Amino acid sequence: MQQPMVEFKNVIKKYDDNQILKGIDMALEKGKFYTLLGPSGCGKTTILRIIAGFTNASSGDVLFEGKRMNDLPANKRQVNTVFQDYALFPHLNVFDNVAFGLNLRKVKKSDVEKKVIEALKLVRLGGYEHREISELSGGQQQRVAIARALANEPKVLLLDEPLSALDMKLRKAMQYELRDLQQRLGITFLFVTHDQEEALAMSDEIFVMNEGNVLQSGTPVDIYDEPINHFVADFIGESNILPGKMVADYQVEIVGKVFECADAGMKPNEAVEIVLRPEDLDIVAVNQGQLVVTVDTQLFRGDYYEITAYDDDRNRWLIHSTNPAKDGQQVGLFFEPEDVHVMRFGESEEDFDARLESYEEED
């Protein structure tokens, strides 16, 4: 494994008696797109501020390319930040906004012009040098803010919820732009968001956070398909989460029935939680279903119907189907063993990863 670009070792951050970060361990490699994902107040922006040098860790080590940088001033770090509100100067034109950091560093005028033009070309705003900020759309203003950060040639770009102020269509377009930009530049991006769709769409790796802890890290596919606990399963996409009991390896009891699953290595009769994603549930005839449910409501979402149904024990089931159903209709539900994800209570990420690796070795 290559040396991490940024590394946290047991980083704790306190404000008086309030512990914001509770022993964070994480590593960011060169040239990858990382996302800190979690609800408001979970500590994700605090991590960004510590990396940028805007605040200090209360304890623990923050390393940059293997060197401790806890006490390194913000202006000495090869890091730049794009803020949620872009922090552009309305009285300066595009060129002067992008050049602002370079001028503070007293970069030669000829080099400033070259770096500004290159940065604007990177974000596809070549020729916009003399535009006023007020003449730009929200997406263009965001790209100016990114160009200003890139003009300083950082090794790590920090992005603090930069898409949150944009409308949905523009936000999705900017997801493509940011991902493409990161791949073209080959530098490390660390993106902060509470929007799981943004995280899944753009990231090489996601850190899911809650209450000052990193609960799970991994690729978007790994975290979506194999959530470690109830919080992650519920926060990453929509889920049916039900109590269950392991009967034996590859067999689990849900709603009083035994189903095949892809999980093993647990104690017989161990209490667990089960995740079934709505898109993995197929509506079939009642006599072909593994479960029978009664349709309660449905909403048309454009490319699928979101159907809410209940079984005889009043367990709620969320189903995503391309075919509509009728309110009050009884239908069967069918799913494959690999669609059943079993979560253990209190399992550490290390033990969880080891369990998943053991399945792969068996295959």
Swiss-Prot record:
Residues 6-236 form the ABC transporter domain. It comes from the Bacteria. ATP binds at residues 38-45. GO terms for cellular component: ATP-binding cassette (ABC) transporter complex. InterPro entries: AAA+_ATPase (IPR003593), ABC_SmlMolc_Importer (IPR050093), ABC_transporter-like_ATP-bd (IPR003439), ABC_transporter-like_CS (IPR017871), Mo/tungstate-bd_C_term_dom (IPR008995), P-loop_NTPase (IPR027417), PotA_ATP-bd (IPR017879), Transp-assoc_OB_typ2 (IPR013611). This is Spermidine/putrescine import ATP-binding protein PotA. It is a peripheral membrane protein. GO terms for molecular function: ABC-type putrescine transporter activity; ATP binding; ATP hydrolysis activity. The lineage of its organism: Bacteria, Bacillati, Bacillota, Bacilli, Lactobacillales. PANTHER family: SPERMIDINE/PUTRESCINE IMPORT ATP-BINDING PROTEIN POTA (PTHR42781), SPERMIDINE_PUTRESCINE IMPORT ATP-BINDING PROTEIN POTA (PTHR42781:SF4). Its EC number is 7.6.2.11. It comes from Latilactobacillus sakei subsp. sakei (strain 23K) (Lactobacillus sakei subsp. sakei). Belongs to the ABC transporter superfamily. Spermidine/putrescine importer (TC 3.A.1.11.1) family. Pfam families: ABC_tran (PF00005), TOBE_2 (PF08402).
